[in-house]
Curated annotation (Swiss-Prot):
The lineage of its organism: Bacteria, Pseudomonadati, Pseudomonadota, Gammaproteobacteria, Chromatiales. Coiled coil: none annotated. PANTHER family: ISOLEUCINE--TRNA LIGASE, MITOCHONDRIAL, SOLEUCYL-TRNA SYNTHETASE. A motif ('HIGH' region) lies at residues 58-68. The gene is ileS. It comes from Thioalkalivibrio sulfidiphilus (strain HL-EbGR7). GO terms for molecular function: aminoacyl-tRNA deacylase activity; ATP binding; isoleucine-tRNA ligase activity; tRNA binding; zinc ion binding. PROSITE patterns: AA_TRNA_LIGASE_I. It is found in: Cytoplasm. It catalyses: tRNA(Ile) + L-isoleucine + ATP = L-isoleucyl-tRNA(Ile) + AMP + diphosphate. GO terms for biological process: isoleucyl-tRNA aminoacylation. Zn(2+) binds at C900, C903, C920, C923. This is Isoleucine--tRNA ligase. Binds 1 zinc ion per subunit.
Length: 937
């Protein structure tokens, strides 16, 4: 038997079937770096319209985790897709480099400031440590395939950025937003510092909840207020309820709601006052069965009544506040303005003292009666003891409730009044302006707007000062007597900023005030506080986005995890509005957190942590990138080894599709061999039209940041339109027709258009694989797919031509029906080419199918395909309902004809040629004649 293998156009490509991504990706990265890929891309994109994505800086401490990987990959997908859409989309990565976590790490190495090391040496060590962390994280981010200016990232500890951070503070001061105040702030005794809102986490905690009697000083006055002449004897007390007994030494008042009804309740030989709605549950808790309401009044009627502190020798007033609720307790709120935000606000109205008997270490100050030197959390038991001894305790019980904790130490925090610097939310109308600015921004998902509006509406003034060493200084001089800022503060801030540009923050810490103030120095105190790190990152719109030539304000997009509504999105918004009256961004996109396959939070103790480093070292970065793109990031993002394995399977489908296309473009030179649409076969025009429809979906989804839709559509295109139909059908034409025939060049033209488009669809997501594909596509090309824009060579199928989209949709439907019957043959170890198919249908469908003539068999991939009227169907024909509501009857039989060894079709004309007796007629034509003619498929 003659071997006809050399007469076939068998697929050939250098593009390997296996990705071997873990090995190949680092080689590609090294090549891109050597070729200065990012720099060249900037040159290619110069002059295009800008797209600015501002990078929220990760903290320069520790290894990157899967959440970091998700964030950086999403940003990279956006930047690359905007580049392909024709924008100049630079990416400047950044790092947050100051603050407590770095201090804690450095303390472990060299000790605490003032003990083992001086402050300047400590800050130097912090800078060195942060730089090491940046270098480590930078390598991990680059390994993910993230393209950016890794040689010139921004660091919040860069001298220039530190200087511009100080200038940003100066601008905020000039516009009237800074204030000094003794206010209660979140305070972590372990940090020894105030915490920002974003540094507070709420966790469940068991506390001592107590109900306490505050004796009424003038009982007759109170009875008059309750419209009572009197009801027996016995003391009258207002009962408060609190879960922080340790704050009672700082009590200055008891607060009631002006519009609630309060009841005077007779219990045994005493009378208690509390909210009427809470009388029944309270008496039940106390175990008082003989309680009887003897009088009522509105809260407003009790304003100004005097009570006696339960264990200190002082009177406290009844005051009114809208914050009092009936959710728990008694409706009477113990008020200590030094230990709570609501207490502080209501206390301002009544001129109450902001008393804070607690030191920065969380211990009561010397001179605090009863409790001096005790830790506040340990003092709860002692407070209860003192109350019990004085007969002031009604009830003490344990309560499990949500309580603020330090995000670093995971320990309960306290509210503590301290002298701090604040960005005021009311002064100069910052809150009002910020709420207006929020409405000008596009929030994705949309619920983000309501979330940040709620947070900005309800948030307290922003405490921006910290009592730390490693941070940007608050470079102010305060008059020792008046407490006012130096009158030349703007000029002084600029002078300090210029010094910081040259020497870093050490320029402030080592500064002798006389150098700037001259003889005034003796009258002023140099502020030693540092800025909250959320201020550092929050002003990057001014220190980075507005300063780097390739960026610019406002940023088109901020993209971070959904926790950043209370973090970076908010600190950026407030500082930008404070500085220039507008938001720093046009759109804000948030992604959910990563969880395991069961929806559980990841933790080392559960053993469910997925480390990005391990994923890229085993599966490759493109698999991780594909998982990110395939997952709806608007909700929680589930990841596990099994999920990543499924992602790798999907990757293989797309890779194999690309490989098939490339392998069948062997010998094709687009400049020489590409056909015009009118010269192409209808099936090939249909394939290009399908690719165009996919491209419209893909580019639209990239624009809307709906990456999971891209994954679904492209994967589906590879599996269904291409894998299950088009590529299957054209194999025969590709392999068996003459190499330079119109039939083959038509299919190659379609495949060329498809791979040119597809490589661009994949490039933002499968960055390594796309570049690998790019190098193998025939024809002249530049060095990177990213140096191009979306492919413009696709074209639509003319709806007026006979073989339009509806025609091919019908063919697909028929083919599926035939395939179901073919499966029975395959189960018997036969192929569809071993079969002959008879189709029985109504006239309209028969006309459609007959339109393909002899070529129907190629579409159905069978040796013979015959069309008959429905009425002539035999009993063993199998009925299949079609999409249009009609029926098709199919009969599949084994062919009795000989099999052509070249095309594997069973044909009756085998042996007709004496020169090639084994071949079928068309193979003879393709081997020895002018080649077969194909008109449709």
């Amino acid at each position: 038997m003659t071997d006809y293998k050399d007469t076939l156009n068998l697929p050939q490509t250098e593009f390997p079937m296996r990705g071997n991504l873990a090995q190949r990706e680092p080689e590609m990265l090294a090549h891109w770096e050597a070729a200065k890929r990012y720099r060249k891309l900037r040159e290619v994109c110069a002059g295009r319209p800008r797209f600015v994505l501002a990078d929220g800086p990760p903290y320069a401490n520790g290894n990157i985790h899967i959440g970091h990987a998700v964030n950086k990959i999403l940003k990279d997908i956006i930047v690359k897709s905007r580049t392909l859409a024709g924008f100049d989309a630079a990416y400047i990565p950044g790092w947050d480099c100051h603050g407590l976590p770095i201090e804690l790490q450095v303390e472990k190495k060299i000790g605490k400031v003032g003990h083992e090391v001086d402050a300047a040496a400590f800050r130097k060590a912090c800078r060195e440590y942060a730089l090491e962390q940046v270098d480590s994280q930078r390598q991990d981010f680059k390994r993910l395939g993230v393209l950016g200016d890794w040689e010139k990232p921004y660091l919040t500890m860069d001298y220039q950025v530190e200087a511009d951070t100080v200038r940003a503070l100066g601008r905020i001061i000039e516009r009237g937003h800074l204030m000094k105040g003794e206010k209660p702030v979140h305070w972590c005794v372990d940090c020894g510092s105030a915490l920002a809102e974003a540094e507070v986490e709420y966790e469940d905690k068991t506390s001592q909840a107590i109900d306490v009697r505050f004796r009424v000083e003038d009982e007759l006055d109170l009875l008059r207020r309750c419209a009572l002449d009197g009801d027996g004897e016995g003391p009258i007390s207002v009962v408060i309820w609190t879960t922080t007994p340790w704050t009672l030494p700082a009590n200055q008042a008891v607060c009631l709601h002006p519009e609630l009804s309060y009841a005077l309740v007779r219990v045994g030989d005493e009378r208690l006052l509390l909210a009427e709605e809470l009388v029944e549950p309270a008496m039940k808790r106390y175990g008082f069965s003989d309680a009887r309401i003897i009088g009522r009044c509105q809260g407003a009627a009790l304003e100004g009544a005097l009570l006696h502190h339960p264990f200190l020798d002082r009177q406290v007033p009844v005051i009114l506040g809208e914050h009092v609720t009936l959710e728990a307790g008694t409706g009477c709120v113990h008020t200590a303005p030094g230990h709570g935000q609501d207490d502080y606000i209501v206390g301002l109205r009544y001129g109450l003292a902001v008393d804070n008997p607690v030191g920065p270490d969380g211990k009561f100050l010397p001179g605090t009666e009863f409790f001096a030197g005790e830790s506040v959390h340990q003092a709860n038991g002692h407070v209860i003891e003192v109350l019990r001894e004085r007969g002031a305790l009604v009830l003490a019980e344990k309560l499990r409730h949500s309580y603020p904790h330090c995000w670093r130490h995971k320990t309960p925090i306290i509210f503590r009044a301290t002298p701090q610097w604040f960005i005021s939310m009311e002064q100069a109308e910052l809150r009002e302006q910020a709420l207006k600015a929020i409405q000008q921004v596009q929030w994705v998902p949309q619920w983000g707007q309501a979330r940040i509006e709620g947070m900005v509406s309800g948030r307290p003034d922003w405490c921006i000062s910290r009592q730390r060493n490693w941070g940007v200084p608050i470079p102010l001089f305060v008059h020792l007597e008046t407490g006012r800022l130096h009158p030349d503060t703007p000029a002084l801030i600029e002078a300090v900023a210029q010094r910081i540009e040259a020497q870093g923050i050490e320029a402030w810490f080592s500064l002798d005030p006389q150098e700037l103030l001259g003889k005034d120095a003796a009258a002023y105190q140099k502020v030693s506080d540092t800025l909250d790190v959320w201020f550092d990152s929050g002003v990057t719109h001014a220190t980075v986005t507005d300063k780097r030539a390739e960026l610019g304000l406002p940023a088109d997009l901020y993209l971070e995890g959904s926790d950043q509504h209370r973090g970076w999105f908010q600190s950026s918004l407030l500082t930008s509005v404070a500085m220039r009256g507008t938001a720093p961004y046009k759109a804000v996109l948030t992604h959910g957190f990563t969880v395991d396959a069961q929806g559980q939070k990841m933790s080392k103790s559960k053993g469910n942590v997925v480390a990005p480093q391990k994923v890229v070292d085993t599966l490759g970065a493109d698999i991780l990138r594909l998982w990110v793109a395939a997952t709806d990031y608007s909700a929680e993002m589930a990841v596990s080894d099994e999920i990543l394995k499924r992602t790798a399977d999907a990757y293989r489908r797309m890779r194999n599709t690309a490989r098939f296309l490339l392998a069948n473009l062997t010998g094709f030179d687009p400049a020489r061999d590409m056909l015009a649409p009118g010269q192409m076969l209808p099936l090939d025009r249909w394939a290009v039209d399908q690719a165009l429809k996919v491209q419209q979906k893909v580019t639209g989804a990239y624009e809307q940041y709906q990456f999971h839709q891209i994954y679904q559509r492209v994967h589906n295109f590879c599996s269904v339109e291409l894998g299950s139909f088009y590529l299957d059908v054209i194999k025969d034409r590709q392999y068996t027709t003459k190499a330079d025939s119109i039939a083959r060049r038509s299919a190659q033209t379609a495949m060329y258009h498809i791979i040119e488009a597809m490589v661009r669809w994949l490039a933002p997501i499968l960055s390594f694989t796309a570049e690998e594909i790019w190098q193998e596509i025939p024809g002249e090309r530049n060095e990177s797919v990213l140096f191009n824009t979306w492919y413009q060579g696709l074209f639509a199928l003319d709806a007026s031509e006979p073989m339009n989209e509806a025609f091919w949709a019908t063919l697909l439907d028929v083919r599926q029906a035939v395939n179901r019957e073919m499966e029975k043959l395959r189960a018997a170890k036969a192929s569809s080419l071993d079969a002959e198919v008879d189709l029985y249908c109504e006239p309209a469908l028969a006309e459609t199918l007959e339109g393909l003539g002899e070529e129907l068999r190629f579409v159905l991939i069978t040796s013979y395909a015959r069309v008959h009227g429905a009425a002539s169907r035999p009993d063993d024909a199998v009925e299949t309902p079609l999409e249009d509501g009609t029926s098709l009857w199919t009969r599949v039989t084994r062919s009795e004809h000989a099999k052509c060894p070249r095309c594997w079709h069973h044909r009756e004309d085998i042996g007709a040629s004496s020169d090639h007796p084994e071949l079928c007629g068309r193979c003879v034509e393709n081997v020895a004649g002018d080649g077969e003619q194909r008109r449709f498929a």
